[in-house]
Amino acid sequence: AVGKSLKGVTSAIFSMRTALVGVAGVAGFGYLVKSSLNATDSLKKTADKIGTTTEALSALRYAAERTGVQTNTLDMAMQRFTRRTAEAAKGTGEAKGAIKELGLDANKLQRLSLDQQMVSLAGAFGNVTNDADRLRIAFKLFDSEGAALVNTLALGEAGLEEMFGRAKTLGLVMSNQASVGVEKANDSFNDMLSIVKGLKDQFSAALAP
């Protein structure tokens, strides 16, 4: 009877362990998917903050990454550039003189999408042959992040457009419509992870002495 009882306990323990492994596996996969959802959710929120589209920002992130610029640096640079371009269009701000020096019109520049604004800048940068002047202008446009973006702008108009096309071909450009869906999916996934965590806690409590 004792042996039969021990056998039953052992079987129960192994069943519980199998269930725990299954839950852990689901949780592990869940966090992997959650990481991807978080990245897209962050892209959408950052694009909204800057006042641009997820298409433009995701393409710019790819071009920046390929020229050695980290995502957070690019995002901050775009926030500052957007604000400074708006100020320049009103005839004020740090970027006013720099935009004029590049031969661009701040009002026309502001009406373009963010990625096309950068294409215009990249084209104009090609006419600035002195490295010190390039750095100085970049600082006026992007503040302290300007130094990092010099290499991105050095791609030129055609080079930057090529990067955008490559990002699209690789499926790295996220549409606004898709990003809205991801925001909703992220909320639903948070609920699912909470349920999984609850199951793990219940199993752990059941195994406790």
Which positions does each model-derived feature cover?
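Low-complexity, glycine/alanine/serine/threonine- and acidic/polar-rich repeat/linker tracts characteristic
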Residues: 1-11, 15-34, 38-41, 45-55, ...
